[in-house]
């Protein structure tokens, strides 16, 4: 999203582009980590380097959650794609949308299908590829 020029991006589940040492918290870029052989280790303390992503049983970033909810509340249009909307808390974010243009794109049905103004049951990759091809 950032590479496409989006200014307000809330990475609720984190990003592999940021990495840090689990022991001393030194930051590492994705390029630095990818250049390492084997398990990535910190050059400062020898600790294991972990991507800044949320793993099972880890807490989500509250600022990212609150920012996401507020952005959804203020959105003129909400496009949700490639998710069954079954995993919470992110699945519940759709309920904060108060606008009148909800677009759902997913291969299978979701519990929010009945609220969608535009519903597409297909692969998000296929739908977006077709949209780009038609726009060009």
Identify the residue ranges that each predicted region occupies:
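Conserved catalytic alpha/beta core of Sir2/sirtuin-type deacylases, generalized to analogous enzyme cores
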Residues: 1-136
């Amino acid at each position: 999203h950032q590479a496409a020029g989006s200014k307000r991006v809330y990475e609720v589940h984190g990003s592999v582009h940021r990495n840090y040492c689990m022991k001393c918290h030194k930051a590492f870029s994705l390029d630095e980590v990818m250049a390492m052989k084997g398990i990535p280790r910190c050059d400062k303390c020898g600790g294991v380097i972990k991507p800044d992503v949320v793993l099972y049983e880890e807490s989500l970033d509250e600022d990212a959650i609150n920012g996401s909810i507020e952005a959804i509340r203020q959105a003129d249009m909400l496009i949700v794609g490639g998710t069954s909307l079954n995993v919470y808390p992110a699945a519940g974010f759709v309920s904060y949308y108060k606008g009148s243009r909800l677009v759902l794109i997913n291969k299978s049905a979701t519990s929010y299908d009945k609220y969608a103004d535009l519903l597409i049951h297909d692969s998000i990759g296929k739908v977006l590829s077709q949209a780009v091809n038609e726009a060009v």
